[in-house]
Amino acid sequence: MPLRHLLKQMPIAEWIMAADLAQRTNLDQRTLDHHVHALIKDGVAIGCCKRRGYYLSEAVDFVDQGELINMLKASPLLRSERLEVLDEVDSTNTRLLTWPELSGFHGRACVTEFQTAGRGRHGKRWHGARYRNIMLSLAWQWSRSSDLVTGLSLSVGLAVARVLSQWAGPGLQLKWPNDIMFSEGKLAGILV
């Protein structure tokens, strides 16, 4: 069962009894409890109490595939049919690298709500909170030598920071070489 469905059935700042939530989601209470505690572990703000049930402490902002597709209609670089939106995946990067048609690799994007094995720089594991981060990978093939893309991570970071600063306002910074920071937290990381 997608966890998104479970969260959509859970009210914001209002208790729902576990039995009622289990019925809404067609889950037994043990499975429901397991899913809720996994969501809490992954950073979703859920209140829980044995006698009162559960509630969302704040609204959850889901990735809207339809909205992304509409936005991509105007894009000359990425076509909507090359976009894949998943609730959960091991790694968006791995997903793209294992795409069956390598000839169709260029210009493909994978967006997810959660990665179980996200990758950071130097092969380090990267973990983002479920439903709080934009986790995506974009496949782009270069016709030039790989040594010409040395500064690409920094260039992409600057471009992303420039766009995000329109919404974020003051306080947005680029931390060498590939992290975009805001209010003392990491807003984005660029991995090339």
Segments the model singles out, each with a brief description of its role:
Residues 2-166, 188:
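N-terminal lobe of the biotin/lipoate ligase/transferase fold
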Residues 174-182, 186, 191:
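Glycine- and Gly-Pro-enriched alpha-helical subdomains that act as flexible
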